[in-house]
């Protein structure tokens, strides 16, 4: 049986979750990452994606995050999200609205670096929309 550790998911609006869990799968910018008890200390950035949490009771919860940072220690993990909502609370058109707003901004962007970031954001949001719509 896997050891438990404390996990907190925090957005600027609220504390979404603070409980003992057995594992958390996070969309790190380097790739999907599974965090378990006694994980090596790590700090990583989070890209838009789905965070899957397996609680100590065995219940699985999924949250959509729109970027942030994760601070991982052997005894716990704190994910500070730019924005986050439980998957079941996500309005289906929210991702489409974000994609369309980024596309409109891209049309008027002048700097290459800004265009590149917007294109990357659109790609991530489009992928996330596909993942969320499958569930």
Curated annotation (Swiss-Prot):
Superkingdom of the organism of origin: Bacteria
Function of the molecule: Produces ATP from ADP in the presence of a proton gradient across the membrane.
Organism field: Rhizobium johnstonii (strain DSM 114642 / LMG 32736 / 3841) (Rhizobium leguminosarum bv. viciae)
Gene that encodes the chain: atpC
InterPro entries for this protein: ATP_synth_F1_dsu/esu, ATP_synth_F1_dsu/esu_N, ATPsynth_dsu/esu_N
GO molecular function, one term: proton-transporting ATP synthase activity, rotational mechanism
HAMAP family: ATP_synth_epsil_bac (MF_00530)
Topology of the protein relative to the lipid bilayer: Peripheral membrane protein
Protein name: ATP synthase epsilon chain
Similarity field: Belongs to the ATPase epsilon chain family.
Pfam families according to UniProt: ATP-synt_DE_N (PF02823)
Subunit structure: F-type ATPases have 2 components, CF(1) - the catalytic core - and CF(0) - the membrane proton channel. CF(1) has five subunits: alpha(3), beta(3), gamma(1), delta(1), epsilon(1). CF(0) has three main subunits: a, b and c.
Gene3D superfamilies from the UniProt entry: F0F1 ATP synthase delta/epsilon subunit, N-terminal
Keywords: ATP synthesis, Cell inner membrane, Cell membrane, CF(1), Hydrogen ion transport, Ion transport, Membrane, Transport
Subcellular location: Cell inner membrane
Entry's Gene Ontology cellular component terms: plasma membrane; proton-transporting ATP synthase complex
């Amino acid at each position: 049986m896997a050891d438990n550790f404390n996990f907190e998911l925090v957005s600027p609006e609220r504390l979404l979750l603070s409980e003992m869990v057995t594992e958390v799968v996070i969309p790190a910018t380097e790739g999907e990452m599974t965090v378990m008890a006694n994980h090596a200390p790590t700090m990583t950035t989070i890209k838009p994606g789905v965070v899957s949490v397996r609680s100590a009771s065995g219940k699985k919860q999924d949250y959509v995050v729109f970027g942030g940072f994760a601070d991982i220690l052997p005894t716990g993990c704190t994910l500070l999200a730019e924005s986050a909502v439980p998957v079941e609370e996500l309005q289906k058109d929210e991702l489409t609205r974000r994609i369309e707003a980024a596309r409109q901004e891209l049309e008027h962007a002048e700097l290459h670096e800004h265009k590149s970031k917007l294109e990357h954001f659109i790609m991530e949001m489009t992928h996330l929309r596909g993942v969320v719509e499958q569930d």
